[in-house]
C-alpha cells in the first residue's frame, strides 16, 4: 500500500469518533446532511439498491437502511468500517445494510452485482486527483443497472466563505485553487486533497452519463467546520441559508460553495 493510502486509512480511522460526535451535536452538519438527503430522495427508486463509497462511520448508510433501502457501504478506513459493523449489529440492520473495507479505486473487487444508485457524500472523492477520479468513474457504469444513477458530493474550487479568510490574513483562503491540491492534516496524517469544479467533474463523466443535476451546499452559509455558527448567530444563519436556497435557482451559482451535489443517469 502506498503512503498516500496509508495516510487516508490512518487519518480517517483516528477521526471516526469525532465524526460520530459531530453528527450528534452540530446543527450545521445536520442541516447540510438534510440538504443532501432531500436531493437524494428525489432521485432514488423505492427500495433501491445503493452502493455507498467513502461511507465514513455509516451515518447515511444507517439512515437509508432504516428507510427500507438496501445499502452496501464501503470505506478504506478500518476505524470507519468498525463503526458501521457495530451499527449493523446494534440496530438490527443485517437485512438492509452490509459493509466492506474497500477503497473507492478498488471497486472492481466488489462481488459482481448491479446497483440502482452509487452515492458518495461530503468530499470522500476529494482524496482523488483528476486522473484518479477518471479511473474511478470508469468503473461506475459496469456497477449500475440500466437507468442507474450516481449522486456525488464534492468540494469545488470556488468557496466564497473560504475566500473571505483573506481579510483576516489567513493564508489558506485560496488553497482550493491550487492545481496540485493541498495536504490536509487529519489527526496528524497528511492527506492529499484535491478540489474539483462541477464543470470538470461533469466532463469526466460525460462518456457514460447524462441528465446532470447540480446543487450547491453552503454557497453563502458557513462551511462545515463552523459547527456552532447557527447557535451563535441564528438570524444571520437563517438569512444566509435563505440566500443558499435562492442561489440554487440560478444555474450559474450551483457548482460553488463548500460542497456541491451532482447527480447523473447512466447512458
Predicted regions and their residues:
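Conserved class I S-adenosyl-L-methionine
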Residues: 1-45, 47-56, 59, 63, 150-177
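Class I SAM-dependent methyltransferase SAM/SAH-binding core
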Residues: 57-107
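A short acidic, Gly/Pro-enriched loop at the edge of an enzyme's catalytic core
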Residues: 109-118
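A short glycine-rich, Lys/Arg-flanked "PGG" loop and its adjoining helix->strand segment in the class I
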Residues: 134-146
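Short alpha-helix
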Residues: 190-209
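A C-terminal cap/extension of S-adenosyl-L-methionine-dependent methyltransferases
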Residues: 213-267
Amino acid at each position: 500500500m502506498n503512503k498516500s493510502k496509508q495516510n487516508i486509512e490512518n487519518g480517517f480511522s483516528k477521526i471516526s469518533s469525532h465524526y460520530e460526535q459531530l453528527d450528534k451535536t452540530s446543527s450545521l452538519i445536520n442541516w447540510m446532511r438534510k440538504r443532501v438527503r432531500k436531493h437524494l430522495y428525489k432521485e432514488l427508486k423505492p427500495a433501491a439498491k445503493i452502493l455507498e463509497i467513502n461511507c465514513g462511520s455509516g451515518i447515511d448508510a444507517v439512515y437509508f437502511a432504516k428507510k427500507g433501502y438496501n445499502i452496501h457501504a464501503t470505506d478504506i478506513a478500518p476505524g470507519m468500517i468498525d463503526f458501521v459493523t457495530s451499527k449493523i449489529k446494534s440496530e438490527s440492520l443485517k437485512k438492509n445494510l452490509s459493509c466492506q473495507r474497500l477503497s473507492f479505486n478498488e471497486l472492481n473487487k466488489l462481488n459482481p452485482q448491479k446497483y440502482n444508485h452509487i452515492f458518495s457524500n461530503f468530499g470522500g472523492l476529494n482524496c482523488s486527483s483528476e486522473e484518479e477520479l477518471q479511473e474511478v468513474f470508469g468503473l461506475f457504469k459496469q456497477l449500475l443497472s440500466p437507468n442507474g444513477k450516481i449522486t456525488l458530493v464534492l468540494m469545488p474550487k470556488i468557496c466564497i466563505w473560504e475566500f473571505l479568510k483573506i481579510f483576516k490574513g489567513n493564508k489558506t483562503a485560496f488553497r482550493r485553487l491550487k492545481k496540485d491540491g493541498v495536504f490536509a492534516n487529519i489527526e496528524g496524517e497528511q492527506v492529499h486533497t484535491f478540489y474539483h469544479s462541477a464543470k470538470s467533474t461533469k466532463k469526466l463523466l460525460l462518456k457514460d452519463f447524462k441528465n446532470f443535476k447540480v446543487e450547491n451546499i453552503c454557497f453563502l452559509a458557513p462551511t462545515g467546520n463552523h459547527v456552532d455558527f447557527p447557535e451563535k448567530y441564528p438570524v444571520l444563519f437563517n438569512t444566509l441559508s435563505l440566500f443558499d436556497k435562492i442561489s440554487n435557482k440560478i444555474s450559474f451559482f450551483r457548482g460553488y460553495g463548500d460542497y456541491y451535489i451532482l447527480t447523473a443517469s447512466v447512458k
